[in-house]
Amino acid sequence: MVGPHKRKSMINITDLRGLVLKSTKIEEAVEFYENLWGLKNIDSWQGDSAFFEATGDEGFILGLVPDNQRGIETIRFALGSPEDVDTSFAELKASGQKLLDEPDRLPIPGEYYGFHLQDLDGTKIELSATSKTKKNNGEDPFAPQRLSHLVVNSPDNVALKDFYLNCLGLKLADWYKGDLFFFLRCNQQHHVLGVERSDNSSLNHVAFHVEDLDAMMRRIGVMSNAGHKPIWGPGRHGPGNNCFCYFEGPDGFVLEFTSELIEVADGEEW
């Protein structure tokens, strides 16, 4: 793969759309996310995979595909329009990035138009747009509303950070202990992606946004009553200032309920 170019990327990612995970215990995981974590299984989707929506307007925020080894299948980022998809594809192709396919209707639930590429650690990235949003499902006011952010581990997190900044147009929002941990954003939310130095490439954790601290405490109660005790929290982070509580899912993925993540205005020095 050609390394990150130094010129400023014209790609304008607007949000973290979702995450698809490889699951080694998909039946247990489906029951967990639907009955305990507060997501809604999209029953209309056929096949061995499972897809879940939150109460927000995104078609689905989490997908599970069966595999004999757990890990990230796809990180999904949003672009503003089909035209943005086409221009982003053209820019990445011209810069020599490894593209896995060309822009097209994606074979996933919803009406998404996009394409895929790989980051420097080989993780598949989706850049997509959609004109269709679902009606807000307000049945449970304490359920997750959307994905907040995810954190990945990387043996060369500096290079991976530079890839997302220079190739995909994310912005550096914060860092922790020098180059140990970088926080990247694409909008005013403090971060949508964290990149942590590690001895391997993997998912560190994925965070689900709930309405407020009260909603987070209620989700903790649901989990605790079902015998799932927090592995960390509840508490409040320094970088981002968000409240948090972490649990372990059936596959061993670390999952976070979070809220109150600070917003950063463009051009703000802090």
Residue ranges and their predicted role:
Residues 2-27, 72-77, 130-158, 171, ...:
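N-terminal beta-strand motif that seeds the catalytic metal site of vicinal oxygen chelate
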Residues 2-8, 90-143, 182-183, 226-270:
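Vicinal oxygen chelate
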Residues 11-59, 106, 113, 152-191, ...:
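Core segments of cupin and vicinal oxygen chelate
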Residues 17, 27, 44-49, 58-65, ...:
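A cross-kingdom feature marking solvent-exposed beta-strand/loop segments within repeated
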Residues 23, 82, 154-155, 213, ...:
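Short alpha-helix boundary/capping motifs
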Residues 29-34, 92, 122, 160, ...:
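Conserved active-site tyrosine of GNAT-family acetyltransferases
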Residues 40-73, 123-131, 174-204, 209-213, ...:
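Conserved short beta-strand elements that form part of the metal-binding/catalytic scaffold
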Residues 158, 163-167, 177, 199, ...:
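Double-stranded beta-helix
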